[in-house]
Design a protein with these regions (language model features):
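Short catalytic/ligand-binding loop motif for oxyanion handling, primarily in non-cytosolic enzymes
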Residues: 2-6, 85-88, 112-116, 159-160, ...
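Conserved acidic functional residues
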Residues: 1, 81, 187
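Core catalytic region of metal-dependent phosphoesterases/phosphodiesterases
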Residues: 4-139
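Conserved beta-sheet core of the metallophosphoesterase superfamily
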Residues: 121-242
Length: 243
């Protein structure tokens, strides 16, 4: 796990039982809990995010959540940033703990591991810069119809600056241009599922209680947010976890 991300998600050495973090989470929401955890680190000169983060506990929790929700014969798409500031050995250990037998990866900006390690690549049925999936039930009144949905680590190219302005330049070549299709993405660590346009859904862990998102949940979200309006609420963006 990324040290800053692990701290923001409540996996810390100074609150190992999540007591204070969870109390804030339940009473004031995730943003308040994140701000508290980050503040503890920044206010203590003896700490930094690497010292404060319990990255092993973070990774164990993510693996446990996936195994609890995703079946052996399901298709699991991981939309990037699978491993960062960790060894490929640890990455492979986490992936091998997943009971799902059909793993697919979309490459994120922290995924250099796939270039150099064939055994890690072999754990996936596919690894692509961007991909598509056929999902059922997204259209209103067409419960059996399938629809092609784009899969990317990044929001649409036109929306990169909506969160972190530098992304519009840094990741322009990697992000897909808007083509009218719905998009599932990660990358932003925002706390809400809403994208910068109604066709985009953030399926990152921070917006979904650190749990994978099912096809049914995706369909339900798009049904609940079906609109012709061009207005989108401002995204609740955290500080960037780093380059």
């Amino acid at each position: 796990g990324h040290p800053l991300v692990s701290v923001l998600r409540g996996f810390t050495t100074f609150d190992p039982g999540h007591t204070q973090y969870d109390a804030l989470l339940s009473s004031q929401g995730r943003k308040a809990a994140e701000d508290w955890a980050k503040g503890v680190v920044l206010d203590d000169s003896r700490l930094n995010f690497r010292k404060a983060a319990d990255t092993d506990a973070h990774d164990e929790a993510i693996v446990a959540n996936i195994n609890r929700i995703v079946g052996e014969d399901d298709e699991l798409w991981i939309l990037g940033d699978i491993g960062y500031r960790t060894s490929v050995r640890h990455l492979k250990s986490c992936l091998r703990q997943l009971r799902c037998r059909h793993l697919h990866a979309v490459i994120g900006n922290h995924d250099d591991w796939w270039l150099d390690d064939a055994p890690a690549r072999d754990l996936f049925e596919s690894i692509e810069p961007n991909s598509t999936a056929e999902l059922t039930g997204l259209g209103i009144g067409r419960p059996q119809a399938t629809e092609t949905v784009n899969l990317s680590h990044f929001p649409y190219r036109e929306d990169l600056a909506y969160g972190w302005p530098d992304d519009a330049v840094r990741f322009r070549d990697q992000a897909l241009p808007f083509d009218g299709h719905r998009l599932l993405y990660g990358h932003t660590h925002q706390l809400s599922p809403e994208g910068a346009r109604h066709e985009a859904l953030n399926v990152g862990l921070d917006a979904w209680n650190l749990q994978p998102v099912s096809e049914t949940q995706i369909a339900d979200w798009f049904h609940a947010h079906a609109t012709d309006s061009t207005h989108v609420s401002p995204l609740d963006m955290p500080d960037s976890p780093g380059p």
